[in-house]
Amino acid sequence: MALTFLTSADLSIDIVVTCDKSVECSDEQRSAYLSSGDLNDLGEVKESATRFTIKALSPSEREEAEVRAGAYSRSELGRILWVESPSGTQEKARWHHALTDDERTAMADYQAYLSRVYAEMVRNSLTHIGGEPASVDQINLIRPDGHRLTVMAELVAHIQRISLLGIEGK
């Protein structure tokens, strides 16, 4: 059979985030870990590393998160611009500078929508931090902001992976 089906959305895993000072890894190790979820792909993970427990989301839970975030009112122009934006930093900066005010607004609206989707996914998936019951509100208290954004992005990457591929991954 060519199609793969997730057998259950009742899966949960413990993960760490790579901005944790108790986690040491290279960019390549970080990328491998985010793809696999296997702690062995990271360089060094100390016992003091913060562990996050997340559960897989069913297709309907993922869709509900998108709807709550505003899927039906998001900017389609912003979505198209987001998809078509260049990947290089300087090239993207010049491209963004050349956008009209309406296009910049549409792109900003779409980026805000994506942030809301990520927050809703974490709200529905995060169950524990360090073995204690947790919520997305605790993630929003992480400082500095760069770490908070990294934690959200990495949680979402793991949530999407286990929700779509199961714990074993690819």
Regions found by a protein language model. Give the residues of each.
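Short, intrinsically disordered N-terminal pre-domain segments
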Residues: 1-13
